[in-house]
């Protein structure tokens, strides 16, 4: 998700998205460990999205 799209969301929506992304990253790590993940770059994408959300949450404080 782009940062501009994330900035339009409220703090509560961002927190919800953050939890969803953290769960997605957990699932990706699990699939990677069990050799079921074909596209490993999706783990990096998830980490970057989490970082974007956390940064925008700090900006809104």
Curated annotation (Swiss-Prot):
Xref: InterPro entries: Ribosomal_protein_uL29, Ribosomal_uL29, Ribosomal_uL29_CS, Ribosomal_uL29_sf
Write the signal peptide boundaries.
none
Q: Which Pfam family, just one, is annotated for this protein?
A: Ribosomal_L29
Q: Which GO terms describe its cellular component?
A: cytosolic large ribosomal subunit
Alphabetized, the UniProt keywords read: Ribonucleoprotein, Ribosomal protein
Q: Which domain of life is it from?
A: Bacteria
Q: Its Gene Ontology molecular function terms?
A: structural constituent of ribosome
Among the record's GO biological process terms, what is one? translation
PANTHER family recorded: 60S RIBOSOMAL PROTEIN L35/50S RIBOSOMAL PROTEIN L29 (PTHR10916), LARGE RIBOSOMAL SUBUNIT PROTEIN UL29C (PTHR10916:SF0)
The UniProt family comment states: Belongs to the universal ribosomal protein uL29 family.
Query: What is this protein called in UniProt?
Result: Large ribosomal subunit protein uL29
Gene label: rpmC
